[in-house]
Amino acid sequence: SIGEELLDDWINEQRKDGFTINHSSIETTGFPFLVRIEILAPNALNSATGLSWWSEKLHLDLQPWDLKRYRLEALGAQQMRYRSPAEKGDFTANTTGIEGVAVISDSGTLTALSLVLKNVRITEADHGSLLKTNRIFADIVRPDYPPIAHTESALEISVAAEQTEVAALHAPILGDTITSIKAKVEFLGPFDGDTIF
């Protein structure tokens, strides 16, 4: 099917960047108005960077007439892990679900990504719990083509979190739980070298 072909092409592209991606069964439903690809037990590993991820189930939705917008839903338990190659940290993030929408530009690069992560718990092997939060919202936006002038936006990242407990912050003025945290960062001008997008 068109969905499985796109997925296989994407997996092969990730190999060039050092990622090994595996999964169990794949089922495609919904054609012709909406294509849903259901992937069981997907996982990804990049030994060189120390990154790994696994999920119970993944849904990828796309419309056959718009191959530049994808909806992603990771169902059930998820785990992302970063183990520093220099053995300076072993971080694990667990969540009960991820929802996202990705938009691909005319040039073939990721131009927008919106994510919602549910019930996030971040721990470090030597220090235990670092952060707990009910939800994290993240939006990443970049232009279709890299900026030329130093005043043009190259990347914009917005992050918000709800009901957050941070182990390192025990300030009485803040209380045990921070109701809402929001941050926005904008990078201006061209980037030197490769970027993750």
Regions found by a protein language model. Name each.
Residues S1-F197:
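Glycine-rich, small/hydroxylated-residue low-complexity segments
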